[in-house]
Amino acid sequence: ATAICYFDPVSSPTIVAAEWYRAWGLPASRQAQAAIKGPIAAHLASGRVLPLIDDLVNSGMSVVGVGALEDLREVKAACRDRISILGNLNGIAMTRWTPAEAEIAVKKAIAQAAPGGGFILSDGHGEIPWQVSDEVLHAIVAATRRWGTYPLQAGLADGA
C-alpha cells in the first residue's frame, strides 16, 4: 500500500475532550502505528481535528483527514509543511449538488488548502454516499483535473 489510513472516530474533539485523546487515544494510536511500515493517514471520521494537529504531527502521522465542518484555511495554517491534509468535501451535501455546485466546492477546497502542496482532495469522511449521482462524481473529477493541477491557476486566489 502507498499509505494506510488509521480511522479513529472516537478521538475527535467533536466527540471526546482533547485531554481524553491524549490520555487514551494517542497511546493506542502510537501502538498501532508501530506495526505499520509506511506512511499513515489519521482520520477522525469527519470530526474536528484542529485542536489535535500538533499531537498528530508529533505522533508521526503523514496525513490528517479533515471533516467538512473544519475551516481548511485554518487547518492548512496549522499543518503547513508538517503534515498533509486529506479532505474535506461534504459527502452528505454532495447528494444534493448539481455539477456546477460540485465544481464550486472543489475549486474552493483547492484554493484554501492546495497552495504550497500537501493537499489531497477527498470527501471529508472516508466514504461517499451511494446517493451521490454519477454526474456529480464526474463533475468532481473534472473540476479536480481543471483546478487541482500544479502550478495552480491564479484564479484560485480568491477561493471562489
Model-predicted regions and their roles:
Residues 1-160:
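Active-site loop segments of alpha/beta catalytic cores
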